[in-house]
């Protein structure tokens, strides 16, 4: 974990392979069927998301916030209004938005809990934004759903920084007919430092405020039907800033 926290601190981002999460003790199941059952339950959460009514892009969304108390206990709900600033997202900044609350079947899911707890530990190891019990923690489920003639894309659609101090992007599923969905890292709007793709289950990109980032629009291969990209964003923000991540 420390190598990823160090890379985040020095480079402004880190790529964490999905194998890292799958090798953690919390993901060691007594048999493969139990793991697959948990994964199937997690994926079902994407069937109950809301098509984003606040901006175009064919993105389906669900949302929750998480609090960690001094005893280490986690609670989930909507504790603060979900709003972005115009400075970071000129498209929908300063608009309070509401999305379906993620159900307990998701927030109690063992695989989701493993991702969340590991992210909490990495932010603690990062040591640059304070203890996690002093931060606003956002959980965003996103489905990018594209067809041949209707791509799916983020907001803002190009290089940007987020309101949040640290953002994790976890890959859950990408359909084989998907085009695009590449992550870009940049030091300057006219200079791309790295292009990478989250492909395998739990492949993760984590970014801070030091670098710009973007994800390229998602499309579908010709005559292949809809293409989907399902991700989980887990965001961490100092409480003096009451805004949330533009995606």
Swiss-Prot record:
Task: State the source organism's domain of life.
Answer: Bacteria
Q: Which top class of enzyme applies to this chain?
A: oxidoreductase
Assigned EC number:
1.14.11.75
Cofactor(s) this protein requires? L-ascorbate; Fe(2+)
Which annotated residues bind Fe cation? Answer: 160, 162, 213
Keywords from the UniProt entry: Dioxygenase, Iron, Metal-binding, Oxidoreductase, Vitamin C
Q: Which Pfam families match?
A: 2OG-Fe_Oxy_2 (PF10014)
Q: Report the co-factor binding details.
A: Binds 1 ascorbate molecule per subunit.
Reaction(s) this enzyme catalyzes, per UniProt: 3(1)-hydroxy-L-isoleucine + 2-oxoglutarate + O2 = (4S)-3(1),4-dihydroxy-L-isoleucine + succinate + CO2
Q: Which NCBIfam families match?
A: Il_dioxgen_HilB
Which family would the database say this protein is a member of? Belongs to the iron/ascorbate-dependent oxidoreductase family.
Entry function: In vitro, in the absence of HilA, can also catalyze the oxidation of L-methionine and the C-4-hydroxylation of L-leucine and L-isoleucine.
Question: How is this protein named in the record?
Answer: 3(1)-hydroxy-L-isoleucine 4-dioxygenase
Q: Which organism is it from?
A: Pantoea ananatis (strain AJ13355)
